[in-house]
C-alpha cells in the first residue's frame, strides 16, 4: 500500500463495467414497480471509494504524505461518479443516497476533511441538484461532522442517530433538513426484542420532518417479523407519514 500505487488508477467510464450492472439493475427494478415511488440511487463519496481500495487509515496517511497524488485520483473518481449519477437520473432516479464513510471527527482534521472530502462531495451534489428533488446525505460512523455539513445541497440527513449519536433532538436544534432514521441498524437491529422494535417506532411517532428508517442498512437476514412490526406500529399510531 505504497502512496505511488495511486499512479496505477486510470479514469473509468461511469456507465460501463460494474456501473453498467447497477444501472441495469435500476432499470429492471423501475420496470417492476407497479406505481411510482421515490427512487434514490446510492452514491459513495470519492474519499469513501478510495478508502475501500486500501483503508481509511492508509488513505489518511497517503493524504498527508503526498496530497497531490491523492487529489489526482479523487478528481478522477469524482468525474466517474458524476457520469454515473447523471445516467441514473436519465433513467428515472429521483435523487441519491449519498454515503460518506470518512465523516468522523476522529478520522482526520477539519482542514483535511474540507480539502479531501467536502470539496468532492459538493462537486458531485452540485452536479445533480438541479435534476433531482430529494437527496439524502448519509454520514457513516461515530462522532460524525453533522453540524458541519448543513450547507450541503441535500434535503435529508441520515446517520447512526440511535446507535452512535448525536440524537435527533440535538441535531434538530440547528438543522431544518428532513431526518432519515430513528431505528437501530445492522447487527444492532438483530439483537432487539419485538418489544424493543415496537418501542423504537413509538418513540419516533409524531416527530416533524422525519422519515422513519434504520441508521444505515438493514441486514438481509433481519426477521420478517421485525419489518411487519414496524409497519403495523406505524399504521396503528397513524404517525411518521
Which residues does each predicted region cover?
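Active-site gating loops and adjacent loop-to-helix segments of metal-dependent hydrolytic enzymes
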Residues: 1-9
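Active-site loop segments of alpha/beta catalytic cores
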Residues: 13-241
Amino acid at each position: 500500500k505504497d502512496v505511488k500505487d495511486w499512479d496505477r488508477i486510470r479514469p473509468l467510464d461511469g456507465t460501463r463495467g460494474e456501473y453498467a450492472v447497477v444501472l441495469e439493475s435500476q432499470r429492471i427494478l423501475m420496470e417492476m414497480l407497479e406505481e411510482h415511488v421515490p427512487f434514490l440511487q446510492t452514491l459513495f463519496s470519492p474519499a469513501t471509494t478510495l478508502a475501500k481500495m486500501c483503508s481509511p487509515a492508509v488513505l489518511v496517511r497517503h493524504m498527508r504524505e503526498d496530497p497531490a497524488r491523492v487529489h489526482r485520483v479523487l478528481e478522477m473518481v469524482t468525474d466517474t461518479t458524476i457520469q454515473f449519477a447523471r445516467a441514473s437520473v436519465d433513467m428515472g432516479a429521483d435523487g441519491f443516497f449519498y454515503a460518506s464513510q470518512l465523516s468522523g471527527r476522529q478520522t482526520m482534521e477539519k482542514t483535511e476533511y474540507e480539502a479531501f472530502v467536502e470539496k468532492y462531495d459538493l462537486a458531485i451534489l452540485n452536479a445533480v441538484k438541479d435534476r433531482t428533488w430529494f437527496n439524502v446525505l448519509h454520514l457513516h460512523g461515530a462522532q460524525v461532522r453533522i453540524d458541519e455539513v448543513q450547507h450541503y445541497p441535500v434535503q435529508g440527513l441520515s446517520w447512526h442517530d440511535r446507535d452512535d449519536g448525536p440524537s435527533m433532538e440535538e441535531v434538530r436544534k440547528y438543522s431544518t433538513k428532513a431526518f432519515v432514521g430513528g431505528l437501530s441498524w445492522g447487527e444492532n437491529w438483530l439483537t432487539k426484542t419485538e418489544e424493543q422494535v415496537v418501542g423504537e417506532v413509538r418513540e419516533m411517532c409524531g416527530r416533524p420532518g422525519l422519515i422513519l428508517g434504520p441508521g444505515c442498512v438493514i441486514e438481509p437476514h433481519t426477521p420478517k417479523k421485525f419489518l411487519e412490526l414496524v409497519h403495523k406500529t406505524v399504521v396503528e399510531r397513524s404517525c411518521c407519514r
